[in-house]
């Protein structure tokens, strides 16, 4: 079903692009460096790195002649924050995806995105989305003078696994104009068996997933005229003073998603704005005085506490280094610092620091001379070590 003739009213933005940029040697070298980042310890990456020049040259020939075909995927599960199937491709395919996504796919497909589509984009991301939610709440309070209002909070059930190949290829090829770009995109989409589902681990899948719900974004903003709307991948919210309007929006959104093979999660609900909403790792709520409060979600706090307990045991056994623990904790700490979480951070700083204050084996004697996780009043500092580049690094 096409609500209100929406699809017929919108015309795609055409952008000319030159496929040669994908197999340009310097771009392939840049893609190779991006693909190996953080993975140089893996055997498959080390094998390519030992003869990177030849690997890049072969890829350049395959792409220029149109003979490149994506390989098979390696599958595994992750369990945080929930169980998900991850499908990752080979280093060769990662190089192609970086070259294609960075030079053509993302620049072209992102052009029709609305401002409040936050996921996996340059200049956006989780903290941008959180700041937009904060600004929406402040604006709502200025307009209505209270925190009385309603929130429709929703996400799509099994989003990546439900994306239909035929609809996705149609959406992509309305924007890509070079037949070679269209052919490569189609090959990547069809590299997974069947006609439904794209792999979470692919760089291209992030761009495709952003585009697949672009129609929803414009429908909510331009047809339903909901100003206070934001989406991060398949997780989105609508804020309104009218509960019945949100119920009607819920119904129309389900009608819009059904032909695309999507359905909303059973946890989708409408609740009072003053209760606050969970979005992007924080619980954000609007007070009766118009102040916006942002706290780390309880699940995030519990997950970090469990990790620190696990790290303490692993450090005692020599299975984890101080640097590894500090890097993991610093990532969570930087995230938590975007909320009103000073006392929580101080508490967890002390827990992290206590790991290194316990009796440890002689393996850690040298490490214990280095600065540990910050305690109360201390500033967390972290140095980034750079490795020397080799082939294709210039």
Question: What do the PLM-derived regions correspond to, one by one?
Answer:
Residues 26-29, 53, 57, 93-98, ...:
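Non-catalytic, well-ordered alpha-helical scaffold segments
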Residues 44-48, 70-77, 111-117, 145-152, ...:
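Short coil/turn segments at secondary-structure boundaries
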Residues 5, 9, 15-19, 103-161:
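Active-site-proximal segment of RNA-dependent polymerases
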Residues 38-46, 71-98, 112-125, 188-210:
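Short, conserved non-catalytic motifs in the polymerase core
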Residues 254-262:
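A common structural junction motif
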Residues 55, 62, 131-233, 237-254, ...:
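Conserved polymerase palm-domain catalytic core
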Residues 1-57, 369-376, 380, 384-391:
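Non-catalytic, polymerase-adjacent accessory regions of viral genome-replication enzymes
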Residues 2-4, 89, 98, 191, ...:
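Right-hand nucleic-acid polymerase module
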């Amino acid at each position: 079903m096409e609500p209100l003739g929406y699809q017929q009213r919108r015309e795609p933005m055409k952008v000319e692009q030159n496929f040669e940029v994908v197999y340009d040697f310097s771009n392939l070298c840049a893609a190779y460096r991006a693909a190996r980042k953080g993975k140089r310890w893996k055997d498959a990456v080390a094998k390519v790195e030992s003869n990177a020049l030849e690997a890049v040259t072969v890829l350049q020939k395959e792409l220029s002649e149109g003979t490149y075909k994506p390989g098979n995927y390696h599958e595994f599960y992750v369990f945080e924050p929930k169980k998900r199937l991850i499908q990752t491709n080979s280093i060769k395919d990662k190089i192609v995806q970086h070259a294609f996504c960075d030079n053509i796919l993302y620049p072209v497909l992102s052009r029709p995105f609305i401002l409040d589509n936050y996921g996996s984009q340059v200049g956006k991301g989780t903290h941008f989305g959180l700041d937009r939610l904060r600004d929406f709440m402040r604006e709502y309070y200025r307009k209505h003078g209270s925190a009385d209002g309603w929130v429709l909070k929703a996400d799509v059930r099994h989003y990546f696994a439900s994306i239909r190949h035929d609809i996705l290829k149609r959406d992509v090829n309305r924007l890509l104009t070079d037949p070679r770009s269209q052919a490569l995109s189609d090959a990547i989409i069809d590299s997974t068996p069947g006609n439904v589902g794209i792999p979470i681990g692919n760089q291209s899948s992030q761009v495709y997933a952003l585009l697949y719900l672009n129609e929803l974004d414009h429908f909510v903003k331009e047809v339903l005229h909901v100003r206070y709307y934001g989406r991060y991948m398949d997780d989105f919210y609508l804020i309104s003073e009218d509960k019945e309007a949100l119920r009607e929006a819920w119904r129309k959104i389900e009608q819009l998603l059904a032909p695309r093979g999507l359905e909303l999660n059973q946890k989708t609900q409408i609740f009072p704005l003053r209760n606050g909403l969970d979005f992007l790792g924080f619980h954000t709520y609007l007070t009766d005085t118009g102040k916006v409060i942002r706290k780390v979600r309880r699940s995030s706090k519990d997950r970090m506490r469990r990790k620190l307990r696990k790290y303490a045991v692993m450090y005692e056994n020599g299975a984890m280094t101080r640097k590894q623990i500090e890097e993991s904790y610093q990532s969570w700490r930087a995230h938590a610092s975007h909320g009103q979480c000073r006392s929580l951070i101080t508490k967890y700083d002390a827990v992290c620091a206590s790991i290194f204050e316990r009796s440890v084996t002689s393996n850690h004697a040298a490490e214990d001379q280095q600065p540990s996780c910050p305690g109360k009043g201390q500033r967390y500092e972290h140095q980034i070590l750079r490795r020397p580049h080799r082939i294709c690094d210039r």
